[in-house]
């Protein structure tokens, strides 16, 4: 998706040129990146737009994790779990309300010992 490439370009080349000034964690660009990875374009755009509007001296700031809606289906517990999955776990879904979850990114790399 072109939005993800633009955001990564901003984070890699433009963001280091200015001081860190985001009032929230995760930063607005990281928040936008997570939104565009997990939501459709329009929902991600509007939630990012309103987040950037809140990132000013009139708001307190703090932790503001993205919220996503997701349907989880019960899994069949009769099979053996596969621990050597091809994809590494990237996000945690922390319950918020009904089918709404906070999205928290895992930042630590797994090391084989």
From Swiss-Prot:
Disulfide bonds: none annotated. GO terms for cellular component: plasma membrane. Keywords: Cell inner membrane, Cell membrane, Membrane. The keyword Membrane applies. It is a peripheral membrane protein. InterPro entries: Membr_insert_effic_factor_YidD. It is found in: Cell inner membrane. Could be involved in insertion of integral membrane proteins into the membrane. Belongs to the UPF0161 family. This is Putative membrane protein insertion efficiency factor. It comes from Campylobacter jejuni (strain RM1221). The lineage of its organism: Bacteria, Pseudomonadati, Campylobacterota, Epsilonproteobacteria, Campylobacterales.
């Amino acid at each position: 998706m072109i939005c993800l490439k633009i955001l990564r370009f901003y984070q890699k080349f433009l963001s280091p040129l200015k001081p860190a000034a985001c009032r929230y964690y995760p930063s607005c660009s990281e928040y936008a990146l997570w939104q565009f990875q997990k939501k459709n374009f329009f929902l991600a755009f509007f939630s990012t737009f309103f987040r950037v509007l809140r990132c000013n001296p009139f708001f307190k700031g703090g932790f503001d994790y993205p919220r996503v809606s997701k349907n989880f289906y019960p899994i069949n517990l009769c099979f053996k779990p596969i621990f050597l999955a091809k994809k590494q776990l990237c996000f945690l879904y922390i319950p918020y309300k009904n089918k709404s979850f906070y999205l928290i990114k895992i930042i630590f790399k797994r090391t084989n010992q």
